[in-house]
Amino acid sequence: MLCCFFLAAKTSLSGNVFKKEMYRLTVYHYTTSAQETVLNNYLKNALLPALHRYGYKNIGVFKLIANDTTVLKTMYVYLPLKNLQDHLAITDKLVKDSSYQKAGAAYNNAVYTNAAYTRMEVILLKAFSLAPQMKLPKLIAAKNERVYELRSYESATEKIFANKVYMFNEGGEIDLFKRLNFNAVFYAEVIAGSHMPNLMYMTSFENKTDREAHWKNFVDSPEWKKLSTLPEYQNNVSHIDIMLLQPMEYSDF
C-alpha cells in the first residue's frame, strides 16, 4: 500500500515537473505609425485583458528594435500554452467575449483598405526537454532599456535539426547559457511555422551593452570552444535569424 502511494506520488510529481509547455508566437508585420497605434491599443486594451481573464499569464509583447527608416516593422506576442487545445480554444472564447469585441473594435472591424497590419503569422512551438517551462527573466532595468533577443536556427533536414536540438539539451548548450546567466525565457522547437525545421529561443539583457558582454563571455568560454568544434555537431545550422526586441510597457515581462 505504502509502495503504491509513493509510486503514485512520483508519477504525479514527474508529470508536473517534466510536462512541456507549448508556446504561440504571433508576429505582426506593418508599415505605418497609424497601424502601430491600432495594434498597441488592441493588444493593451483588448487582447491581453481577455487572455488574463481566461487565466493566461506571462504574456510578452515586443517590438523589433529597428532604425526609424525601416519600412517593414514587426511586433511579437508571446503566449505560453498548456497544450495545443488552448490555441484552438482561445479563438472560440474571443468570438463570444463582448468585452473583448468592444475594446478591440478598431482592430476587429477595420476595413480591408485600412487593416492594422500588412501580414500576420502564427508560430507554434514545443518546449525543449531540458527547459520544459518558461522562466521570467530576473532583470532590474526599466522596460524601455531592456533587450530581449529572439533567435531562430534553421537546419537543412529534420535529422540534422534533431542533432542541433540534442546539442542544446544533452550536449550542454542550455547549461552554458544558464551558467553565464543569459536569463533565457524559453527554448523550443517549432512544430508549425514557415521556416521549418527550426528551433527558437529567447534570452534577455538589461541593455545592449549587457547583451554584448554576455555574448563575448559565451564565445570566449572554454565550453563553447570545445562544443562548437566537436565533429558530431558540425553544419547542423543552415540559417540564423536574430531579432533584438524591446518589451512594450504593457507587456507582462
Regions found by a protein language model. Give the residues of each.
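Bacterial N-terminal signal peptides
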Residues: 1-8
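Short S/T/G/P-rich N-terminal loop/turn motif that feeds into the first structured element of a domain
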Residues: 12-101, 105-106, 110-224, 234-253
